[in-house]
Design a protein with these regions (language model features):
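Charged, alpha-helix-forming regions
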Residues: 1-202
Length: 202
């Protein structure tokens, strides 16, 4: 990379951080705040059974094999089919196949915050699928979707609150159905509130 390009990048980064400081957040495309990880083609019949979940595109692992193609934190967006746009978070070894994986660009976002802002747009992502037969989401279109990015400190605060609600919802799985539903609605309400940012107009 040339010095000129370096200076341009530094100026862009400085401007973005200035806007973030003045307004409290800035809108950035997914391509700016994440590092893409594309899944690999695999078949169950051509694999050896194991305990590594295969993320095929549904809301649950498709099956389990003996090898992984990613370790550490990652957010996966299902690429095709009925569940296209479904967002999941993983912090264990997995094998990503029919899905878009996104690691966080740590300069801008934490992985868990990236998960929550994508999860909050799940319906919008699902509506982006195109094509006859088995519809799919375009990776190029997905990379252009913009998200609100506050400071890393504010992200940690938001994630801390949403994590507590998520834990609470999961921990009362033995409770009454009405209580579970009420907690889930409360969680979704606060998630929407915490992740609601106005568009910045020039």
């Amino acid at each position: 990379m040339s010095r000129r390009t370096d200076r341009q990048t530094d100026r862009q980064t400085g401007l973005i951080k200035l806007i973030q400081y003045v307004f409290g957040y800035v809108w950035l495309p997914l391509s700016k705040i994440s590092i893409p990880f594309r899944g690999e083609y695999i078949t169950k019949s051509g694999s050896t059974a194991g305990d590594i979940p295969v993320i095929l595109g549904g809301q649950e692992p498709a099956y389990y094999i003996d090898k992984c193609n990613h370790t550490g934190e990652i957010v996966v967006v299902a690429r095709s089919g009925v569940s296209a746009g479904f967002v999941s978070y993983w912090d264990e070894p997995i094998f990503v196949t029919d899905g878009f994986g996104y690691e966080s660009n740590s300069e801008w976002v934490t992985t868990k915050y990236l998960f929550y802002i994508l999860k909050n747009k799940e319906n919008e992502l699902n509506s982006m699928k195109r094509g006859a037969g088995v519809p799919h989401i375009s990776g190029a279109a997905l990379s252009e979707v913009k998200f609100p990015v506050p400071s890393l400190k504010e992200q940690e605060r938001i994630v801390s609150i949403l994590d507590r609600f998520d834990t609470l919802c999961n921990d009362i799985s033995e409770g009454l159905p009405a209580e579970i539903e009420a907690r889930q609605k409360q969680y979704e309400y606060y998630r929407d509130k915490l992740l609601s940012f106005k568009e910045l107009k020039p």
